[in-house]
A protein has these predicted regions:
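Active-site mouth loops of central-metabolism enzymes
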Residues: 70-81, 149-156, 207-209
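Divalent-metal coordination cores built from histidine and acidic residues
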Residues: 88-173
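C-terminal cap of metal-dependent C-N hydrolases
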Residues: 13, 376, 381, 391-425
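His/Asp/Glu-enriched, well-ordered alpha-helical/loop segment
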Residues: 248-258, 277-288, 294-402
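Histidine-rich, glycine-flanked metal-binding segment
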Residues: 2-60, 425
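Divalent metal-coordination and catalytic microenvironments
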Residues: 13, 26, 31, 56, ...
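Active-site core of metal-dependent hydrolases
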Residues: 168-298
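Metal-associated gating/positioning segment near the N- to mid-region
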Residues: 54-114, 245
Length: 425
């Protein structure tokens, strides 16, 4: 038997594909899903298969996080390819089987160095790690007024000179580029990439994020080809009953895929639920905006921090060193802040992985089917990868997560190989 003929039978689990399938058996052949069905498992038919008993467990597609700045102690902007392997593995063991590594505003030299590292990993999958689908360029072409924690020094209007340099450095692996469409030639930039996305740019997606656009400017950008919103609500104009902005354009235009950070800190759950109510589960993708802290146990990060009781937060010395910055980084309520307690305090990013985000959304009253859809199939569709990933169906990549009743991952499979396995066979 060759490795490509290897068979694995996952039997007796409650399957959400992401739609509920009841108790089903899933047969894996090589790196693909061979079949899924509710009929009794016939051991004689798959005598050569490795049998995994998923009774009393839940089986879902591998989660897809499209906004990941780091994890496992590594930050996309400041790490080489070797260090970013830790990020891929930290997310994988938590059931996140595909990630888009996100790069913040910085010098072109630093951005291109990061894009090269991500491009290498996109073309050379990490053993035991989440599949890196490509990179997400965020903040470089954003608004100075809505920069959030982006480095103000390096923000500039969208331009083709920088973009083509980034595209070359990435080896054609940039999946998403976020812009403030109101800046200079934002519309022309968007139209060009949207027009030639499939032909010349491997289906790159143009998003609006860190934007101070008016409603009319945002609508014009959507008409020009923007199809995605970078972490909706955070770093964007709007949320006013008279002076409408980007947020209202996202709500009222069905073609926009709206990312939403689901740590409960970046966005109040009431607004997150309102967004989902308006756009539906097929229009909203769950993301984390995770930093280097994601996937690290409290015991580990607490060793690199100092508790400050006045702020009820932990100051992270190692994050400060990792980022090469004179800013102070704090963990508070599962989010990372800069300069907490000062006038310029800002949210820096998240420290959860998407599996924790999934549990949050379920705790907000959504069914598991709804939450899983927003963490799997919806993001896969937004990247035009739903023919490969995002659901449990014959012919698709065998990216699966087996959960216990509390939605903790007991086993994780990426393209037919277990990267975590705590179940009996």
């Amino acid at each position: 038997m060759t490795p490509d003929d290897t068979k694995i039978a996952i039997i007796g689990g409650e399957v959400y594909a992401p739609s509920y399938q009841s108790k089903s058996n899933i047969i894996i052949r090589g790196d693909k899903i061979d079949s899924i069905g509710t009929e009794s498992y016939d051991a004689s038919e798959y005598q050569s298969a490795t049998v995994v008993n998923a009774a009393d467990c839940i089986v879902i597609p591998g989660l897809i996080d499209t906004l990941v700045h780091g994890g496992g102690g590594a930050d996309t902007l400041f790490s080489d390819a070797k260090d970013l392997e830790k990020t891929a593995r930290a997310h994988a063991v938590q059931g996140v089987t595909s990630i888009v590594l996100t790069i913040s505003s910085a010098s072109m030299e630093q951005i291109n160095r990061s894009l090269e590292a991500v491009g290498y990993l996109a073309n050379n999958p990490v053993e035991g790690g989440a599949r890196i689908l490509g990179s997400y360029v965020e903040g470089k072409f954003g608004s100075r007024e809505k920069r959030g924690a982006q480095n103000l020094e390096y923000i500039c209007p969208p331009n083709f000179e920088d973009f083509h340099a980034m595209w070359a450095a990435s080896d054609g692996t940039i999946k998403i580029i976020s812009i403030a469409p109101e800046d200079d030639d934002g519309l022309g930039f968007t139209k060009h990439l949207a027009t030639y996305s499939e032909e010349a740019y491997n289906n790159i997606t143009v998003a609006m994020g860190h934007t101070n656009a008016t409603y009319d400017q945002a609508k014009a950008a959507i008409d020009a080809g923007i199809t995605r919103a970078t972490h909706t609500f955070n770093g964007m104009s709007g949320m006013h009953h008279r002076n409408l902005g980007a947020v209202e354009a996202i709500f009222t235009h069905p073609k926009i895929h709206a990312e939403i950070i689901v740590d409960g800190q970046h966005v109040n759950r009431i607004w997150a639920k309102t967004l989902i109510m308006w756009k539906g589960i097929e229009g909203v993708g769950l993301v984390t905006d995770s930093t280097a802290s994601a996937g690290i146990s409290k015991e580990e990060w607490i060793q690199h921090s100092v508790y400050e009781p006045d702020l009820d937060a932990y100051r992270l010395d190692w994050e400060k060193l990792s980022a090469g910055s004179n800013l102070n980084y704090y963990i508070k309520n599962r989010a990372v802040w800069i300069n907490l307690g000062e006038r310029d305090a800002r949210l820096y990013g998240g420290m959860i992985t998407l599996m924790e985000g999934l549990r949050n959304v379920v705790s907000w009253g959504y069914s598991l089917e709804e939450a899983v859809t927003m963490a799997t199939l919806t993001p896969a569709k937004s990247l035009k990868l739903d023919n490969q990933k995002g659901s449990i169906a014959p012919g698709k990549d065998a990216d699966l997560v087996i959960l216990d009743a509390e939605l903790n991952p007991k086993a994780v499979m990426i393209e037919g190989k277990f990267v975590k396995h705590e179940l009996s066979s």
